Amino acid sequence: MVFRWLCVLLIIRMVLTYRVRARNTSADSENKIHDDATAASFGFRGGLVPGVTVYAYMTVPIVERFGLDWLERGSMQVKFHQPFYDGEEVLVRAEVDMSADPIKVAITAEGKDGIACATALATVNDRSEWLGEPRLQDYPEAPLPLIEARPVPSRELLLPGAVLGTLTEPLSLPDTAMLARLDERLPIYSDAPAIAHPFTLLSLANQILVRNYKLGPWIHTASDLINWSGVRDGERISVRGRIADCFERKGHEFVVLDLLLVANDGRVIQRVRHIAIYRPRTS
């Protein structure tokens, strides 16, 4: 009887793990927080591994276990507490509660000495209410500014409700170069019909910020997202959004974006609440 009870407990609660060597996938990007010298001037040990890269690592156990049930019908709230640096080992732990409705997964990305550098709570097969069901009419399209005409962000400019210029990107899958940079080996992203990687989608949240404003070094700190459908080779994604909030905390200037990713057929792909420090305090 005790053995049977233990077996049931193991079925409804499981721990999935994944190890990977962190890579600074944006060392040459416009955002110089990923550059060793610039990051050091802000008090870091080197260029920061991008938050979207850490997020990609954190999705591996949940996608390996649940596949499309998460990629097309799941959510995640992820926060980045401390940076990873290039070459460090990342241990991802995903504690799955199969008894919850919807299924819940508590995820940590641990670095040196077991420190949780990032944490997340995910749900599977979830049409969660915490972000609300998106309506296309709430996310109007708008033109992007010219690269050379992008304004420098400020609290006076980043007013809640301000509409962002729409970013449109075609998809060509599988993106083998990106998968190699992430050391990603799950066949769902490489075998036909390949689906877009979570890294690809959340990277668009960064890109719409960069294409709307002329930024100095900046830091992605958190994202709350819910997946509504997958997107595949040949589709075109438009990223629409607005400013949700702008505030100062401990000398850092933050911006919060409310974004909707839409396929060319009008299908909602993902809604994202994306949070970044657009102007870090100087050390």
Describe each region flagged by the PLM:
Residues 3-20, 82-155, 227-283:
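HotDog/MaoC-like acyl-thioester-processing domains
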Residues 3, 8-73, 129-222, 283:
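Hot-dog-fold acyl-thioester-processing enzymes
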Residues 53-96, 100, 119, 198-243, ...:
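Hydrophobic beta-strand-centered segment that forms part of the acyl-chain substrate-binding groove
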